[in-house]
């Protein structure tokens, strides 16, 4: 993936380093990957009045990718001990979105499971004492999500606005989750399921983002090829016209024109 991000063109110039086409855009140290380019986008003149981009900043292609579902993200607290699994959720009413963070807290008393929803941004209660059933759907502030399984007493889940996350960070999270020992750890299997569920969605979003950028680049390259083809055709026409003009007997042509004017 880093090799792809450090791709070069046929001149050996890096495609995703902004204006710094001689600088490798992404530098890797273990699992840490830093962007070393800038935010520039190189342009080429395709006509007297128009320019087209021939590069993209690597930060825009590989790092500015919204995590979660693109609007908000869900997460299980790493200290949860139950088997509650939360999905990525969806937006059901964009006009009700607040951009606040919410927390879903579970209580289990005498075998009955309830949950409270708290807006942790404002510190206010959204709802309390809600009865929980398996595969429960929860709606809050224009968002909808589901939790299945059996959350334990004290387990909690968060819902917060999506933020930019690089595709490298997403892959790193998956690797870390898979390498973390789970034997004998309460809720470890459920914790892994929650992490993989979230990060696989992030991978999907990352691939969609990169493919969209690739499509845009391909469209620009195709337009440049088309303009080159049109320019070549015009060159041929100009050469033919020039050849015809060079073959004209100008003395005879002037004489004929004068006779026509008499």
Predicted regions and their residues:
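Amphipathic alpha-helical polymerization modules
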Residues: 2-30, 52, 172-262
């Amino acid at each position: 993936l880093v090799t792809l991000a450090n791709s070069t063109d046929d001149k050996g110039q890096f495609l995703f380093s902004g204006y710094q086409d001689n600088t490798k855009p992404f530098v890797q140290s273990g699992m840490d990957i830093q962007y070393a380019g800038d935010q520039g986008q190189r342009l080429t003149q395709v006509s007297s009045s128009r320019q087209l981009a021939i590069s993209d900043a690597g930060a825009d292609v590989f790092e500015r990718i919204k995590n979660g579902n693109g609007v908000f993200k869900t997460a299980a607290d790493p200290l949860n001990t139950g088997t509650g699994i939360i999905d990525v959720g969806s937006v059901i009413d964009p006009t009700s979105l607040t951009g606040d963070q919410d927390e879903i807290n579970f209580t289990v008393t005498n075998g009955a499971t309830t949950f409270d929803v708290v807006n942790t941004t404002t510190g206010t209660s959204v709802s309390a004492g809600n009865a929980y059933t398996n595969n429960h759907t929860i709606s809050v502030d224009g968002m909808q999500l589901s939790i299945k399984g059996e959350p334990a007493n004290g387990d909690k889940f968060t819902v917060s606005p999506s933020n930019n996350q690089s595709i490298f960070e997403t892959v790193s999270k998956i690797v870390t989750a898979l390498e973390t020992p789970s034997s004998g750890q309460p809720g470890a299997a459920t914790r892994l399921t929650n992490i993989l569920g979230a990060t696989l969605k992030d991978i999907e979003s990352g691939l969609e983002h990169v493919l969209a950028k690739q499509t845009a680049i391909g469209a620009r390259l195709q337009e440049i090829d088309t303009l080159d083809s049109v320019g070549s055709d015009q060159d041929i026409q100009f050469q033919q016209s020039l050849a015809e003009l060079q073959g004209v007997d100008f003395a005879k042509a002037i004489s004929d024109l004068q006779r026509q004017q008499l």
